[in-house]
C-alpha cells in the first residue's frame, strides 16, 4: 500500500529547544500511485482460487483502445500530484472540522509547510487531470467540512433507468484517497524518530491511499454473427452504480445512477478455437452503493445491494435497422464488487434482425457467471 510520510525538520540537540514557538516547519511526502489490475482486483474466491481476469478477457487492448478509453489496460500511474487538506482540532480529538488549516495542491510528491501544535486530521487524494479537457470528477468541499464528496454530473444521453434522473452520468476518472485522524503534532515530539542521515525528525503515519473508483471491463461475445450485426454506435450504459464517493471514509453514496461509457466492436477475434466478434468497453465507477470494498479483502461475497444493474447499447443490423440490447448483469456486478470482467455471450443464430428501425422485443440467451444459461428480455 501507499504511505504518507510527515517529516519535521530539526537539529540533533534536544528537539524541544529547537522548534519554533507555536508550530514547526514540516515536510510532507506522498508516494506516487502505481498499480496493475492483479493487485486492484485481489479477489480470492471459493477454495482459495484467486481471480484470473486475463483468462476471461478476450477483447484485447490495442493502441486504438488506449486512445479511445483514455489509458492503458493493465496499468495506472498518477503523475499529476495530490490535493491535501489538514484540519487542526487543537487539543480536542473529537472537535468538529472547521475550514481546513492546510489547503494545498502539490505538483509532485512532497511539499513543506508550517504546522501549528495540535491534533490534526489529514486528507489527501490524487489530483485528477483529464487530457481531453475538464475532469468529469467534481469535488464538494462546501456542503460540510466533516468530509469531502466526489461526484460527477449528467450527460446529454437519455436513459431508461433510475428515475428521477432521466440522463446518464459521466464516469469518474481514477481516484484514490487517504485519511488519517488524530495526528498529534506536539512539542514533546512523542512518536517521532530521528533520521540521522538527513538530520530530521520523522513521524511515520500508517496512512493508506485506497481506491474510491472501480473498473469494469465489459465484453459481449457474438457467436455465429456472420455480419448480422454490422456495427454499434459506440455508446454503452451501466445502471445501478453509485453517483458519489466519500473521500474520508471510502464509502460510496446511496444514490444509484446510470453511467455512460464508450464501446468498440472488433471482428473475427479467435477465442477458444472459434472466430467471434466482440464488443468491448471499459467503465470506471464509484462502485455499488453504500459500500467500501477496501475494508475486507475480496472473497466473492455478494453485498446486500438492492439495486439492479443493466448494461445496454444499440447495435446496427445488416438490414439497416438497429436494436437496443439490454443485459441484466446484477449478479455479476455484486459478485465482482471491486470491479472485474463482465462477459456476455450471444448466439446470433437465435436472434432475428428487427423488421423496423428502433428494434423489437425478443429474448436472448446469455451465459451466466456460473456457466449456466438463462434468458433475459430485450
Model-derived segments and their meaning:
Residues 1-2:
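Sec-dependent signal peptide recognition
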Residues 7-10:
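C-terminal motif of bacterial Sec signal peptides marking the signal peptidase cleavage site
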Residues 89-210:
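Short, low-hydrophobicity acidic/polar segments
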Residues 12-145, 336-378:
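Acidic/polar, low-complexity intrinsically disordered N-terminal segments immediately downstream
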Residues 169-170, 174-271:
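A sequence/structural signal for flexible, mid-protein segments enriched
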Residues 22-27, 114-118, 199-201, 208-212, ...:
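Solvent-exposed loop and beta-edge segments used for protein-protein assembly and interaction
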Residues 65-136, 229-334:
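Tryptophan-paired
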Amino acid at each position: 500500500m501507499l504511505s504518507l510520510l510527515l517529516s519535521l525538520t530539526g537539529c540533533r540537540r534536544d528537539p524541544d529547544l529547537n522548534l519554533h514557538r507555536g508550530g514547526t516547519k514540516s515536510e510532507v511526502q506522498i508516494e506516487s500511485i502505481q498499480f496493475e489490475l492483479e493487485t486492484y482486483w485481489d479477489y480470492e474466491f471459493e477454495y482459495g482460487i484467486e481471480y484470473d481476469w486475463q483468462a476471461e478477457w478476450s477483447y484485447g487492448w490495442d493502441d486504438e483502445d488506449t486512445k479511445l478509453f483514455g489509458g492503458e489496460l493493465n496499468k495506472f500511474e498518477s503523475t499529476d500530484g495530490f490535493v491535501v487538506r489538514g484540519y487542526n482540532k487543537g487539543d480536542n480529538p473529537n472537535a468538529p472540522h472547521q475550514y481546513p488549516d492546510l489547503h494545498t495542491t502539490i505538483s509532485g510528491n512532497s511539499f513543506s509547510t508550517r504546522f501549528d501544535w495540535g491534533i490534526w486530521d489529514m486528507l489527501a487524494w490524487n489530483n485528477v487531470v483529464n487530457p481531453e479537457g475538464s475532469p468529469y470528477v467534481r469535488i464538494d468541499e462546501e456542503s460540510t467540512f466533516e468530509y469531502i464528496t466526489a461526484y460527477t454530473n449528467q450527460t446529454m444521453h437519455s436513459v431508461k433507468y433510475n428515475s428521477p434522473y432521466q440522463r446518464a452520468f459521466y464516469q469518474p476518472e481514477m481516484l484514490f484517497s487517504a485519511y488519517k485522524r488524530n495526528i498529534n503534532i506536539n512539542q514533546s515530539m512523542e512518536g517521532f524518530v530521528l533520521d540521522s542521515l538527513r538530520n530530521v525528525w520523522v513521524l511515520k503515519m500508517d496512512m493508506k491511499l485506497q481506491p474510491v473508483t472501480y473498473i469494469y471491463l465489459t465484453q459481449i461475445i457474438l457467436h455465429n454473427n456472420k455480419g448480422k450485426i454490422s456495427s454499434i454506435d459506440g455508446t454503452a450504459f451501466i445502471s445501478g452504480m453509485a453517483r458519489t464517493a466519500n473521500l474520508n471514509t471510502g464509502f460510496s453514496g446511496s444514490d444509484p445512477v446510470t453511467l455512460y461509457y464508450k464501446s468498440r466492436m472488433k471482428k473475427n477475434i479467435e477465442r477458444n478455437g472459434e472466430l467471434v466478434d466482440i464488443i468491448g468497453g471499459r467503465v470506471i465507477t464509484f462502485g455499488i452503493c453504500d459500500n467500501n470494498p477496501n475494508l475486507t479483502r475480496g472473497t466473492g461475497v455478494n453485498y446486500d445491494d438492492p439495486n439492479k444493474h443493466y448494461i445496454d447499447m444499440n447495435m446496427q443490423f445488416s438490414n439497416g435497422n438497429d436494436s437496443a440490447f439490454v443485459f441484466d448483469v446484477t449478479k455479476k456486478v455484486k459478485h465482482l464488487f471491486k470491479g472485474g470482467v463482465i462477459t456476455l455471450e450471444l448466439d446470433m443464430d437465435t436472434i432475428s434482425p428487427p423488421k423496423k428501425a428502433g428494434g423489437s422485443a425478443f429474448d436472448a440467451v446469455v451465459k451466466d457467471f456460473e456457466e449456466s444459461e438463462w434468458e433475459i428480455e430485450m
